[in-house]
UniProtKB/Swiss-Prot annotation:
The lineage of its organism: Eukaryota, Metazoa, Chordata, Craniata, Vertebrata. InterPro entries: KRTAP_type8/19/20/21/22, KRTAP_type_19. PANTHER family: KERATIN-ASSOCIATED PROTEIN 19-3-RELATED, KERATIN-ASSOCIATED PROTEIN 19-4-RELATED. Keywords: Keratin, Repeat. This is Keratin-associated protein 19-5. Residues 5-56 are annotated as: 14 X 2 AA repeats of G-[YCGS]. The gene is Krtap19-5. Interacts with hair keratins.
Length: 62
């Protein structure tokens, strides 16, 4: 599975994005949750990064 995520996911709206938009797939981030993708999903691939909007996640990994 490929998690590219969307801009909305990167902002932590909790919406799973799709397509190579270069941001992240957030899961309730910004509300103290955690998910895939940091605020800037282009930073690092497959490595755990802190989410700028709260929680933990992985920036854009394949």
């Amino acid at each position: 599975m490929s998690y590219y995520g969307s801009y909305y996911g990167g902002l932590g709206s909790g919406i799973r994005g799709f397509g190579n938009l270069g941001y992240g797939y957030g899961c309730g981030c910004g509300f103290g949750g955690y998910g895939y993708g940091s605020g800037y999903g282009r930073y690092g691939y497959g490595y755990p990064r802190p989410l700028y909007y709260g929680g933990y996640g992985f920036s854009r990994f394949y």
